From Swiss-Prot:
Binding site for FMN: P19, M20, M21, Q72, K141, H173, N213, G214, G215, G235, R236
Gene this chain is encoded by: dusA
Descriptive protein name: tRNA-dihydrouridine(20/20a) synthase
Cross-referenced SUPFAM superfamilies: FMN-linked oxidoreductases (SSF51395)
Function: Catalyzes the synthesis of 5,6-dihydrouridine (D), a modified base found in the D-loop of most tRNAs, via the reduction of the C5-C6 double bond in target uridines. Specifically modifies U20 and U20a in tRNAs.
Alphabetically ordered keywords of this record: Flavoprotein, FMN, NADP, Oxidoreductase, RNA-binding, tRNA processing, tRNA-binding
Amino acid sequence: MTLPPPAAYADSLRLSVAPMMDWTDRHCRVFHRLLAPSARLYTEMVHANAVIHGDRQRLIGFDAVEHPLALQLGGSDPALLAQAAQIAQAWGYDEINLNCGCPSDRVQAGRFGACLMREPALVADCVAAMCAATALPVTVKCRLGVDDDDDYAVFAGFIDQVVGAGAAMVVVHARNAWLKGLSPKENREVPPLRYDWAYRLKQERPALPVVLNGGIASVEASLAHLQHTDGVMLGRAAYHDPYVLHQLEAALSGRPERARADLLQAYQPYVQAQLDQGLALKHMTRHILGLFHGQPGGRVFRQVLSEGAHRPGAGWELVEQASQRTDDQARRIAA
């Protein structure tokens, strides 16, 4: 497996956006790239079988602006994952990430996701097979454990096995996955966060790139976590309040923050290109509803787009209308 130099690879992991089912599609990722030019982006999880047998353009196609971009795979069959990894490399991805953190019933029934944390030897076999099949970095996203697991040594042992098999980096969602009794949404909120386990993992294994995920919602929290880990991965915060992603990018890069209206306008050429291909406006605008979150007029922006983007023939002028009404509302509030 060919990897970038360790320091350069670790630097590229400082900021990333989590793979989120039904959210981080290609339109979302293009928007996030505009907000955070240096961030590492991740696809929604795609099962290895779907990559091999499905409509690849629909499932794993992406815009060149999205680099660096990782394909997150689901599955537990080493041979299928290896084949999917080869396809991902041919399509131009920068990283392959194996999902060992999703707790949904459907995923459990397929023997992948978080339940794999109880089968570290199998995960190691999957990682080794993908590493043998591709020159791309193969990484793992996992939880601290499942259900009532409360033994750091077991968690660290899982990490050691997958890293020993060739994993180049681990993303640690710093809470357990409860496989019974909680929905996937509740599993992102109810199990307590234990950042200290990720910190300890990095402290004890300084050569291993460790990215922290789970409950990170502000620039201040991100910068604090970066004192202990190589990177932070924003999830829901990057989606519901995407300007936080831009603010963190600015803090890490030293570049000045851009106004929300400027970032919105930067999205226009991509949106127009999709509209010209016959795609409905709603597929792009659903990812920008939170751009003015917490700002005067922010609710107006969300309302105009939510009510109008699904209508036949809706175009960029609706976004301009939403932006103008947001400005008008902000002026009235300030007056």
